[in-house]
């Protein structure tokens, strides 16, 4: 295996995980903050808000998992070799 390809794959894997985590991290923080604010304003809607929050957090976390899958593919099943 060419050392340049190996080094580029490791760097790309790190960038894939890092960049794939930024957006969902910001989104999850914003969503949780807005959910807490919504529950504070309207406590009787707490169950509905919490259910919607958990579903949306799962969808956001899926984006990070996709980045991890790409990184693992670059590290262990390198298509450039």
From Swiss-Prot:
Q: Give a GO cellular-component term.
A: chloroplast thylakoid membrane
**Subcellular locations according to the entry:** Plastid, Chloroplast thylakoid membrane
Asked if Methyltransferase is a keyword of the record, the answer is: no
Classification via PROSITE patterns:
ATPASE_C
- Write down the superkingdom of origin: Eukaryota
Primary localization = plastid
What the entry lists under Pfam families is as follows: ATP-synt_C
- What are the alphabetically sorted keywords of the record? ATP synthesis, CF(0), Chloroplast, Hydrogen ion transport, Ion transport, Lipid-binding, Membrane, Plastid, Thylakoid, Transmembrane, Transmembrane helix, Transport
Please give, as recorded in its UniProt entry, the membrane topology of this protein. Multi-pass membrane protein
State whether keyword Cell membrane applies: no
Which parts of the sequence are marked as the site Reversibly protonated during proton transport? 61
The residues that cross the membrane are 3-23, 57-77
Q: Which family does it belong to?
A: Belongs to the ATPase C chain family.
UniProt-listed HAMAP family? ATP_synth_c_bact (MF_01396)
Q: Tell me the subunit arrangement.
A: F-type ATPases have 2 components, F(1) - the catalytic core - and F(0) - the membrane proton channel. F(1) has five subunits: alpha(3), beta(3), gamma(1), delta(1), epsilon(1). F(0) has four main subunits: a(1), b(1), b'(1) and c(10-14). The alpha and beta chains form an alternating ring which encloses part of the gamma chain. F(1) is attached to F(0) by a central stalk formed by the gamma and epsilon chains, while a peripheral stalk is formed by the delta, b and b' chains.
Q: What else is known?
A: In plastids the F-type ATPase is also known as CF(1)CF(0).
Know the name of this protein?
Answer: ATP synthase subunit c, chloroplastic
Per the UniProt entry, what species is this protein from, by scientific name? Ipomoea purpurea (Common morning glory)
The beginning of the lineage is: Eukaryota, Viridiplantae, Streptophyta, Embryophyta, Tracheophyta
Q: What is the gene called? A: atpH
